[in-house]
Amino acid sequence: MKAFKQKQVWFITGSQDLYGPKVLEQVAKNSEQIVHGFNESSAISIEVVYKPTVKSPREIHAVCQAANSDENCVGVILWMHTFSPAKMWIAGLNELSKPFMHLHTQFNAELPWSEINMNYMNTHQSAHGCREFGFIGTRMRKERKVVVGHWQSSDVQAQIDDWCRAAAGWHESQNLRIARFGDNMRQVAVTEGDKVAAQIQFGYEVHAYSLGELNEAIADIAEGDVTAQLDRYASEYQVGNELFGDEYQLDRLRKEAKIELGLTQFLTQGGFGAFTNCFENLTGMTGLPGLATQRLMANGFGYGGEGDWKTAAMVRIMKVMGQGRAGGTSFMEDYTYNFGATDQVLGAHMLEVCPSIAAAKPRLEVHRHTIGVRCDVPRLLFTGKAGPAINVSTIDLGNRFRIILNELDTVTPPQDLPNLPVASALWEPRPNLAVAAAAWIHAGGAHHSAYSQAITTDQIVDFAEMAGAELVIIDADTKIREFKNELRQNSVYYGLARGL
């Protein structure tokens, strides 16, 4: 079963009528076998759909238009089995609005040395057919992914899956609606941004709603539904006897369950995939949602604290991209440092860290929250599982958006955190904290990020290219002088590409 049940990527093979019916029959047969192989492979998470070989400008234009209008198609894979004169592709590529990958492969892995003849050469000539197609892509300034190698190779299939996941994320971005309850945290700069520019570039919509509208949805929740929700909590988390046995804590938990159900109903009925709130805008609320927000993220919603709609969008997009993969994705904040033999960052937030990143079964507890509405708030406590991860931040620079990515290694804390009443993750940034933090600050990265152990750097690279957005990467090879030069060069490039 593919992780993406209703999404598809179309496989389109280019050729021409020059070669005659026998060669074209072989081209079609080989293409169908490749598609079958992709669909049988557990390495590729999206259904690949075979499309008949295109041999003329009219056929190419028609299939590109069909891909554009198909709601389930998130992108197309293009392969030139034979030579397909690239002028035939101009109208179709001009029309194509879905992302496309250029797969540079051939059906047979090895040459049949003792049998090869000109018929074989004319049939299996992607080595130069794909170069012709590559030229027109470059000439038309088309952003695309190029994957090279035999189609049965595990590395090739991994690259295809990365791109397919990015295409699914891009499709989600084009259709995403984000609900904002309240505004940004007062006086904070980085969470601000141009929502119109974001919708033009990324596709997602951001809409604001009053706390009154949300409170009405919460008030409509039946007490029987609240009781059923508490039963779910008891079965899914570690819950001490004192929580359900204490009348006050139980009341706080019932209020939190009602918030969760009301939020879920509001977001679902409105077609929203992500939301934000702010501890400074909680009029009429019984508290800042803690457990409620954590569970909504665990169920796939994006979230951004203090009105951070850009991070909320990226959390949702990355959750979609990571479907079916081990690891999780969460809203996160760089909170405090551990300077020592290896410098580390303790990431957390007031309450809202997604349990999809937990190393063990989370504990459900009620603790005092002292920012905004001061009250006792139920929340899940855990530490993030060890392993490679990334932090991704999207910022608005005025004339463009920049995505910043830092590769990390999440580690197990050397000691317990008995007095920390929030979920957290401890990580070591690559190449080290000194370089990573300096580069992040030079790039203007936010204190919020989308943290993930399910998503790879390559997937974010593919997504950023689909969006036409600037991406800077902080990894094991980063050096500050080179990184600062990259930022300067990017400023010139994007200024010329889009206008100052």
Swiss-Prot record:
Q: What's its EC? A: 5.3.1.4
Name its GO BP terms in alphabetical order: L-arabinose catabolic process to xylulose 5-phosphate
As its record notes, the protein acts as a catalyst of:
beta-L-arabinopyranose = L-ribulose
**Which SUPFAM superfamilies does the entry link to?**
FucI/AraA C-terminal domain-like (SSF50443), FucI/AraA N-terminal and middle domains (SSF53743)
Cofactor(s) the protein requires to work? Mn(2+)
Note one Pfam family from the annotation: AraA_N
Q: Which UniProt keywords apply?
A: Arabinose catabolism, Carbohydrate metabolism, Isomerase, Manganese, Metal-binding
CDD domains hit by this protein: L-arabinose_isomerase
**Which top EC class is named for this enzyme in its record?**
isomerase
Q: Does the keyword Metal-binding apply?
A: yes
Q: Which family does it belong to?
A: Belongs to the arabinose isomerase family.
Q: Please give the name of this protein.
A: L-arabinose isomerase
From which source organism is this entry? Shewanella sp. (strain ANA-3)
